[in-house]
Curated annotation (Swiss-Prot):
Zn(2+) binds at residues 317, 321, 332. Disulfide bonds join 196-267, 274-292. Its EC number is 3.4.24.39. GO terms for molecular function: metal ion binding; metalloendopeptidase activity. One of its GO terms (cellular component) is extracellular region. Residues 20-188 form a propeptide. Keywords: Cleavage on pair of basic residues, Disulfide bond, Hydrolase, Metal-binding, Metalloprotease, Protease, Secreted, Signal, Virulence, Zinc, Zymogen. Belongs to the peptidase M35 family. GO terms for biological process: proteolysis. This is Neutral protease 2 homolog MGYG_04094. Binds 1 zinc ion per subunit.
Length: 366
């Protein structure tokens, strides 16, 4: 097995040749409007309108336009958020294809329809509230621009529904359940070795080693690196530092060779979540992580540039999505440096990419 060069300490790193909530904004600053309406028992139609005078090129990844069963809306019942059963994905944010965008002309609208029973546990039925807030990354150009230049903020109306439990129960879950009775390596996150080629297994083991080292280094740095903590998490309070240290240590334990393994990690996709652009994804309600082909082909083991995506921080990012590692599990509230650092303190603390970016910044001294 190809072994990556490493220093002896766990903090030493293997070196190689880098729908969501957003900060509250006045309505006049929003470039888009989103209205939710019900078209069936649990079927939701989102109407997205460009309020401006210029065309918008809207990135679909991890937004209400996403074709994957990601978290497009928040669903509440009796003041408590309903269990999410879909996927949380990390997307490749460089060299974006025009196919990943939806172009919306001035004052024009587009509709997106999805069934919330496919990604939420609505088997109890009853009254629920559905809403969406977040940002949609926008690109410059007239229909084919792919360089992200801004973010369109939105906050939808609140939609009240009375769900028929029998009808909701008849809707198939988008991601289903995974049979975990397979060959595994058990002394950390459980790698499903039956899903791995030799080269994939070596890459994943290296990424887990680096994820542990990055996370441990971040945990140790957080109490001293208050400027960097403030940059990514907007607070240096005692509770914030305590939470960061605890969560990074938990990721390090789950990633390292001496853990009991509370998650299961697959080298390849068995749940059909690896659509174009997906690096890896997590099923948070099952504590399962899946790597996609471009995780191996398009990412270096470790980044050499600040805020660049790599295998190690992608694995770290996915670890924070698992409720067995971080509770409550982190969501995808802001992607990349610009979006992640625009979040509020409470949002950043629950944003998976904020942890990946902070760990990268500590490692490279960004």
């Amino acid at each position: 097995m190809q072994i990556l060069a490493a220093l002896s300490a766990i903090g030493a790193l293997v070196a190689t040749a880098t729908a969501a909530a957003v900060p509250n904004a006045p309505a006049k600053q929003s470039m888009i409007d989103i209205q939710l309406s019900a078209t069936g028992n649990t079927l939701i139609k989102a109407t997205i309108t460009n309020k401006g005078d210029k065309a918008l090129n809207l990135l679909q990844f991890n937004t209400i336009l996403d074709k994957n069963p990601t978290r497009k809306v928040r669903v509440y019942q009796n003041g408590t958020e309903v269990k999410f059963t879909g996927m949380l994905a990390r997307y490749k944010m460089s060299n974006l294809s025009p196919d990943y965008f939806t172009t919306l002309g001035p004052k024009s609208s587009v509709e997106s329809t999805f069934d919330i029973a496919r990604t939420h546990d609505l088997t109890r039925g009853g009254k629920i509230t559905v809403m969406a807030s977040g940002t949609i990354p926008t690109a410059e150009g007239h229909g084919n621009g792919t360089s992200i230049t801004g973010y369109a903020r939105y906050e939808s109306n609140k939609l009240e529904l009375d769900v028929d439990a029998k009808k909701a129960s008849s809707v198939a879950q988008a991601m289903g359940k995974v049979n975990k009775s397979r060959s595994t390596i058990d002394k950390r996150t459980n790698i499903d070795t039956s899903s791995c080629s030799q080269s994939q297994l070596e890459a994943l083991e290296g990424a887990l080693y680096n994820s542990a080292a990055l996370a441990q280094a971040a945990a140790e740095a957080a109490p001293q690196s208050t400027d960097t903590v403030a940059e990514f998490f907007k607070s240096t309070s005692r509770n914030t530092i305590k939470t960061l240290v605890s969560r990074f240590q938990s990721v390090a334990r789950e990633s390292t060779y001496v853990n009991d393994g509370r998650t299961t990690y697959y080298c390849t996709d068995s749940m059909n979540g690896c659509s174009p652009g997906v690096l890896a994804y997590t099923l948070p309600d099952q504590n399962l992580i899946f790597n996609c082909p471009i995780y191996y082909s398009d990412l270096p083991p470790l980044a050499q540039s600040c805020y660049e995506q790599d295998q190690a921080t992608t694995t770290l990012h996915e670890m924070t999505h698992n409720s067995a590692v971080v509770s409550p599990f982190c969501d995808d509230l802001g992607y990349g440096y610009d979006d992640a650092t625009s979040l509020s303190a409470s949002q950043a603390l629950q944003n998976a990419d904020s942890y990946a970016l902070f760990a990268n910044a500590i490692y490279l001294g960004c």
